[in-house]
C-alpha cells in the first residue's frame, strides 16, 4: 500500500481554513494530494485558488459546524475513488507535515483490508492524527455508502451540549467514535509509532537561537489552532522544506 491522499475538514473559521493553501503545498512537496472538506455554503474568496483541492459540504449546517468539521473527515474518505493499493489518511487542519518518512515508511507491508493507526490507543479514544486506509475500508468500518449516510451519522452522534470549546463537553466525540468503530475491526493495525512533534513554544525557541533546517528533526508541527497567529512560523517551515 502507499499513501497518496490526505484529508482534513474545516468550517468557516478563518484561523483554520487559511491553512488550506499551506496544507496543499506541504503535502505536495512529498508527492501527496491534500483534500480539504469545507463545511459551509460557499468557499471563501481568499482560498478560492485552492478550489481543486476543496470539497464543499453544505449539509448539517443547522448544528454546530465545528462539530460537523471535526467528524466529517472520518466519514468522507469512504466516498473517494482510488486504486486498490492507495491509502487516504486524515489529519488536523492545524497540523502540518515536516517529512514524509513518518507517514509512508513500511506501508508496503500492508494490504487493502488493513486500517492503519499510527499512534497508540488512549483509553477509549483513537487520535485523529493519524489514521490511514483504503476508501473501501473507511466505508466498511463506518458503514458509509453515500453523502446521505454521512449526514445521518453526524446528526445521530451530535451532542446538543457541544460548544466547540477545545477540551470541553463532547469535544472528543470524534476520537471516541473512532475507537468504537475500530476496536473490533479484525484488520486494525496499531503501529504505536512514536512521533516527534514540534509545538509553537519550541519552534519559537529554535527561531530565537537562530537555528536552521531544524524541521528535519520533526515529523509534524502543531500550529496551534491559528494560521494568523503563527503565519511567520509557517512561512519559516515552508522555506525549510
How should each PLM-predicted stretch be described?
Residues 96-127:
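Conserved donor-nucleotide/metal-binding helix-loop-beta segment in metal-dependent transferases, i.e.
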Residues 139-241:
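Catalytic core and acceptor-binding pocket of nucleotide-sugar-dependent glycosyltransferases
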Residues 1-62, 84:
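N-terminal anchoring/stem segment of glycosyltransferases
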Residues 61-88:
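A conserved donor-nucleotide-binding helix/loop in the catalytic core
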Residues 12-16, 96-97, 138:
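Short acidic, S/G/P-rich loop/turn micro-motifs used as interaction or catalytic elements
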Residues 125-138:
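Short glycine- and hydrophobic/aromatic-rich loop-to-beta-strand nucleating segment
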Residues 90-96:
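The conserved acidic donor/metal-binding loop of glycosyltransferases
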Residues 18-21, 25, 75, 172-180:
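A structural signal for well-ordered alpha-helical segments within the folded catalytic domains
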Amino acid at each position: 500500500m502507499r499513501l497518496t491522499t490526505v484529508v482534513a475538514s474545516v468550517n468557516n473559521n478563518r484561523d483554520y481554513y487559511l491553512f488550506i493553501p499551506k496544507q496543499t503545498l506541504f503535502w505536495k512537496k512529498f508527492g501527496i494530494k491534500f483534500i480539504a472538506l469545507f463545511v459551509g455554503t460557499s468557499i471563501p474568496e481568499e482560498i478560492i485558488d485552492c478550489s481543486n483541492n476543496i470539497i464543499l459540504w453544505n449539509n448539517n449546517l443547522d448544528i454546530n459546524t465545528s462539530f460537523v468539521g471535526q467528524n466529517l473527515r472520518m466519514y468522507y474518505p469512504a466516498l473517494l475513488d482510488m486504486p486498490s493499493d492507495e491509502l487516504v489518511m486524515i489529519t488536523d487542519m492545524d497540523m502540518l507535515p515536516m517529512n514524509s518518512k513518518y507517514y509512508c515508511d513500511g506501508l508496503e507491508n500492508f494490504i487493502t483490508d488493513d486500517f492503519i493507526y499510527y499512534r497508540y490507543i488512549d483509553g477509549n479514544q483513537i487520535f485523529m492524527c493519524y489514521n490511514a486506509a483504503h476508501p473501501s475500508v473507511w466505508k466498511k468500518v463506518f458503514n458509509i455508502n453515500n453523502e446521505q449516510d454521512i449526514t445521518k451519522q453526524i446528526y445521530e452522534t451530535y451532542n446538543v451540549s457541544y460548544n466547540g470549546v477545545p477540551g470541553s463537553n463532547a469535544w472528543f466525540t470524534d476520537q471516541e467514535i473512532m475507537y468504537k468503530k475500530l476496536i473490533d475491526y479484525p484488520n486494525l493495525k496499531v503501529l504505536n509509532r512514536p512521533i516527534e512533534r514540534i509545538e509553537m513554544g519550541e519552534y519559537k525557541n529554535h527561531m530565537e537561537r537562530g537555528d536552521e533546517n531544524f524541521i528535519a528533526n520533526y515529523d509534524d508541527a502543531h500550529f496551534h489552532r491559528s494560521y494568523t497567529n503563527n503565519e511567520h512560523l509557517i512561512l519559516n517551515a515552508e522555506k525549510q522544506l
